[in-house]
Amino acid sequence: MSRVGSKIINVPENVKVFIESGMVHAEGPKGKLSTKINDGINVKINEKEIVCFPKQKDRQSLAFWGLQRNLVNNIVIGVGEGFIKKLEMNGVGYRASVKGTNLELLLGFSHPILYPIPQDLEIKVDKQNNIEISGASKQLVGQVASEIRSFRGPEPYKGKGIKYADEHIVRKEGKKK
């Protein structure tokens, strides 16, 4: 019995969910999202709740049961409330700014890095070194945050670089004479 898969998904009042041609579609104030239903999983929508359960008790269906439930839950939460990832920049001269449809990053390289902002996301920069990425798709928000972080990941000696706001960097001691 899957502990994650057997949980019921509650649908908020402002979100509309329906199943069409093997896809679960959700519409809400933050936009529209959809996810494919796995072949071994059934998804039922009752009033204001969604239930996922496997068609058969084979190994593969049971493995995808919890995954399918979480994918459906993520689109329901995404179109209702949205997801937010926060990044912090530490380092002398490290700055960020939004210029049109690009995020400009000054990270100590000889050139600025221009990162194109996807249409479905909103990026805000606060005090030139705090970046907030928000959007309906949890996968896209996390992927963009990861790509921005990868330009200059945090280093363990001085803590310079881009890190998630809730991330703890294990610091190392420098070389001793």
Protein language model regions, located:
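N-terminal intrinsically disordered, cationic/polar leader segments
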Residues: 2-146, 150-164, 168-177
